[in-house]
Swiss-Prot record:
Subunit structure as annotated in this protein's UniProt entry: Isoforms 1 and 2 can both homo- and hetero-associate.
InterPro entries from the UniProt entry: SCAN-C2H2_zinc_finger (IPR050916), SCAN_dom (IPR003309), SCAN_sf (IPR038269), Znf_C2H2_sf (IPR036236), Znf_C2H2_type (IPR013087)
Protein's organism: Homo sapiens (Human)
Record's signal peptide: none
Domain SCAN box: 52-134
Name assigned to this protein: Zinc finger protein 396
Name of encoding gene: ZNF396
Tissue: Expressed strongly in liver, moderately in skeletal muscle and weakly in kidney, pancreas, spleen and prostate.
SMART domains assigned: SCAN, ZnF_C2H2
Length: 335
């Protein structure tokens, strides 16, 4: 038994030079088996993201033994982080960026990954641009702002479209339904099963009746509902509805063919081709394609520095500058 443990220990303590040799042989084999003119050529067909995913998804059962499993992990990690090319700081950047993307809400994860940020600083800048866009003239539906956007836009607009005389009966029916459903709850432990089943049937029939009443009101105002939906689609602000197939429809740019999952993102992208810059600075008349960029530009006139370092108190006008500054503190703290 001790002999086996000793052998395993020697395998686990293999040097990085041995692993590098394995990597070199593997890379040479890949390139020899690939046609240089083929689209599957090693240097162009495999990206660091591919190796990152393989590294994270690799399972012990995918290898014949512990030695092969460890060697494969070394190989995939090496191909992902590329220590022969990247500095220690760049490798840390990749690891931190991966974890940062992992903790984002799923909607934001998908959006950020489509834009392929190269580092954490670029990712933060992109997310802050989105946050500012939410407060600007164009409201964009986004992950954690979903409830805010729905609350801010939907109730007021729907109220304007539907007359109050039609909304009130629905409200009263819902209130009545709530009271009646409460009254159906059994308060006596000795109530027979037949009574419970009867109450359940009453709840079901009541729910069906209310659903039909609400559906009738919505159908009576079909043209107004279409107007409401069309307005938000034009502005690129149509909110995602669960189970709505139209939301999944992809938006394609006619100029370059790039695909977007949201019409709002397509509208912003099309300004690159059209050169449209609807946001102008009041001070110098310089125009910008996005309101978020205009907000950053205005700080050059006002001297506003909203981003403050908690370690030394130094303030910055842009988050990217604060991000670079914070790295210096981190490097000083790390021995």
């Amino acid at each position: 038994m001790s002999a086996k443990l000793g052998k395993s220990s020697s395998l686990l303590t293999q040097t990085s030079e041995e692993c590098n040799g394995i990597l070199t042989e593997k890379m040479e084999e890949e390139e020899q088996t690939c046609d240089p003119d083929s689209s599957l050529h090693w240097s162009s067909s495999y990206s660091p993201e591919t190796f990152r995913q393989q590294f994270r998804q690799f399972g012990y059962q995918d290898s014949p033994g512990p030695h092969e499993a460890l060697s494969r992990l070394w190989e995939l990690c090496h191909l992902w982080l590329r220590p022969e090319v990247h500095t220690k700081e760049q490798i840390l950047e990749l690891l931190v960026l991966e974890q940062f993307l992992a903790i984002l809400p799923k909607e934001l994860q998908a959006w950020v990954q489509k834009h392929h940020p190269e580092n954490g600083e670029e990712t933060v800048t992109m997310l802050e641009d989105v946050e500012r866009e939410l407060d600007g003239p164009k409201q964009i539906f986004f992950g954690r702002r979903k409830d805010m956007i729905a609350e801010k836009l939907a109730p007021s607009e729907i109220t304007e479209e539907l007359p109050s005389s039609q909304l009130m009966p629905v409200k009263k029916q819902l209130q009545g339904a709530s009271w009646e459903l409460q009254s159906l709850r059994p308060h006596d432990e000795d109530i027979k099963t037949t009574n419970v089943k009867s109450a359940s049937r009453q709840k079901t029939s009541l729910g069906i009746e209310l659903h039909c009443n609400v559906s009738n009101i919505l159908h009576m105002n079909g043209s107004q509902s279409s107007t409401y939906r069309g307005t938000y689609e034009q502005d690129g602000r149509f909110e995602k509805r669960q189970g709505n197939p139209s939301w999944k429809k992809q938006q394609k740019c006619d100029e370059c063919g790039k695909i977007f999952s949201q019409s709002s993102a397509l509208i912003l992208h099309q300004r690159i081709h059209s050169g449209k810059k609807p946001y102008a600075c009041d001070e110098c008349a310089k125009a910008f394609s996005r309101s978020a960029i205009l907000i950053q530009h205005r700080r050059t006139h006002t001297g506003e520095k909203p981003y403050k370092c908690h370690d030394c108190g130094k303030a910055f006008s842009q988050s990217s500058n604060l991000f670079r500054h914070r790295k210096r503190h981190i490097r000083k703290k790390v021995p």
